[in-house]
């Protein structure tokens, strides 16, 4: 097929019928990632690396405006109408901190391949009209009230405890030169002064084929797929947005080659100004603690989020080990952290969750504690530190750890059977955003079972060493 060059192809080692291929257009730089497996549904995730250094919410506003029509189909509702004819449940999208993805799921491939070029026309060549901006993003209504779909959505979120704590964490971890610091949904104060011209400029820069990937999941006829992809690639050339495989001169890959690639910082004594707001207290080397106020009628409880810097994103074994360790610590009423904080006469919280955000520079591990009694807010992270040190001194319950590992294997295989598109899409989107462009990093990303085999050989000492390195001796950020 003219223009689309083979980059990478691999079978899943533990599921040979599942194959992943990656291509990159030599004419436009458009990346295509295709996971092939038998399934009645076909999924697409049109993904763009959307880097923004302000709180204007431009990536989020674009996500909404795309659905209002395109150059070839300048009417709202065209996508939903076509989706119904293709046995699809409409179209959808999400805006994350580092990307925007537009989703399509259809029953069967015929309607899917007919709809994909239409969907891409909406994403890459939207109308972006003044009237669409006024209705969808921001306006003042007849009652002299702030209004607009995006504005109203963020009005409902901006002052929630979860959003306030997450934004404060981002502000503390990243310097002002990093896009990870931004509120990509848009703060209300910024949305009120945003203009359609700013959105058009952003779209022209980031909604380009060299900064986009079409992630496909499901069974498709190769010849028909390449025909559809070729029509999409040709459209870029026709519209003059094709700037070659590597983009225009001076183009830098978002998050990977820009200032956002700088690792986050918790130890504020080593890099002046990184992640520090003027009103925040000075940090010490092992603990930075900040407070966030949010509107709440019940002042008897609060929330606590503790963050540590994790390994780099390419250390997949260490990341999977930390994921398993987090499950061991929190997954059930018999887990150590549930026993210590929840399953007691006077609970110190009602729920605990440990997860990680995989970002350029370093990943970030975060433990979230819900509904913490106000009297315990100041002491919770110290209580956690004492518990973790006690676990290290007593050792890991290896019988239970083996059970956790076995259950995690079974959960992955079950998801691969029941929801394969979800399993593949996360890995493939991550590879597009941060992976090596020749596809050589995919082999390791897809081989979860090999890593489970390696973790099966971990001793109690190996697990406690991991716990000590990342959750005890590592500097922590405490947001209360």
Describe each model-derived feature in a short phrase:
Residues 218, 404-480:
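C-terminal regions of mature proteins
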Residues 1-8:
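Short, small-residue-biased leader/transition segments that mark boundaries at the very start
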Residues 69-71, 78-202, 247-251, 306, ...:
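Acidic/histidine-enriched segments that form metal/cofactor-coordinating
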Residues 18-22, 154-159, 163-213, 222, ...:
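Histidine-acidic residue clusters that define the catalytic metal-binding segment
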Residues 46, 104, 304-307, 363-371:
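Short, hydrophobic beta-strand segments
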